[in-house]
Amino acid sequence: MNRSKGSSSRRTFLRLAALLLPAGALLGSLQGVRAAARPRKLYLAGPDVFRADAVAHGEALKALCARYGFEGLYPLDNALPKQLAEPREQAAWIYRANIGLIERADAVLANLNFFRGAEPDSGTAFEVGYATALGKPVYGYVDDAGSYAERIRRHAPELIGEDPTRDRDGMTLEEFGLPLNLMLAVPATLVVGDAEQALRQLASRRHG
């Protein structure tokens, strides 16, 4: 008797569920959540925009993204309006355009190699922070392994003081075994290698 009542209750529940939730809707929504969690559009951050071949390099990066199933969004995709002649206006327009690309992207792929010193490009660092604040995944790549302090000693020995744990101004070299300052290294997934190696890892997680 109890088994019969239980079976009847289950049938009633299933009929109600069928009325309230169209067939396949739950599966579709779950697949949508999974798809949203797998980045498709990547903002390509880095000091590469300062290269002599910046446009060609950006096209190569976007082609590389496409090879791994992503759409690359490169800062120089934005064409500066010709009517903006004043440098400050141009700078403000570029800032807003880059912010717009980050907001459109599902994730950020960042070149975090040292640039003009023993730190990544400051603009790229800001973009990483902005993307992190938006809850977007960040994948960064650096050419060489080692801790932040080790990499500074290797790339910029002229900055090191008599005490190898401090720079020439007496400031402590950060040493947590991370390749960059912790405020970049903790939120980002860092890959030792180039953009393709970072994309390969990102793609493997996407399809995993």
Which positions does each model-derived feature cover?
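Conserved catalytic or regulatory cores that recognize and/or transform ribose-phosphate-containing ligands
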Residues: 7-208
